[in-house]
């Protein structure tokens, strides 16, 4: 019985040892994507970005800072009924775990003025910075479509 207990504790310890900054960044990215589906992309971006964020996406100049993102989103709201979802496929982290990135694929879905489906897919890289409370927020997001909207 003691042998099974020791093996069980060893397995648990090895599982816990596998969790680390990369896994935490993947988890943050997944929670960020979930919020995008539940509350809208802009709300999720504002909730997960740092004050000094850099956003490089779309056909506009880079957006520098959270206040600039808030202003941009106020003038350019999420299209009604649209969704933005993404899936992280890889994470890298510094040895200290204070910063790193995730990368993956994204899917944007909406309808045009005539009700026709618009679907755009692409790739992204998001830079993450560990906060004082040990959670991660992103300070860099770069996204690009891999083909024209259809």
Regions found by a protein language model. Name each.
Residues 1-7:
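Bacterial N-terminal signal peptides that target proteins for export
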């Amino acid at each position: 019985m003691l042998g099974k207990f020791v093996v069980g504790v060893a397995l648990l310890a090895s599982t816990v040892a596998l969790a680390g900054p990369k896994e935490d960044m993947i988890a943050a990215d997944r929670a960020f994507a979930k919020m995008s589906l539940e509350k809208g992309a802009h709300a999720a971006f504002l909730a997960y970005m740092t004050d000094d964020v850099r956003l490089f996406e779309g056909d506009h100049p880079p957006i520098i800072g959270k206040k600039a993102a808030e202003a941009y989103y106020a003038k350019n709201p999420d299209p009604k009924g649209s969704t933005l979802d993404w899936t992280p496929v890889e994470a890298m982290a510094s040895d200290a775990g204070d910063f790193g990135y995730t990368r993956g694929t994204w899917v944007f879905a909406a309808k045009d003025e005539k009700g026709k489906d618009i679907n755009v897919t692409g790739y992204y890289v998001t830079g993450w910075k560990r906060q004082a409370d040990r959670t991660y927020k992103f300070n860099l997001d770069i996204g690009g479509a891999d083909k024209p909207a259809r």
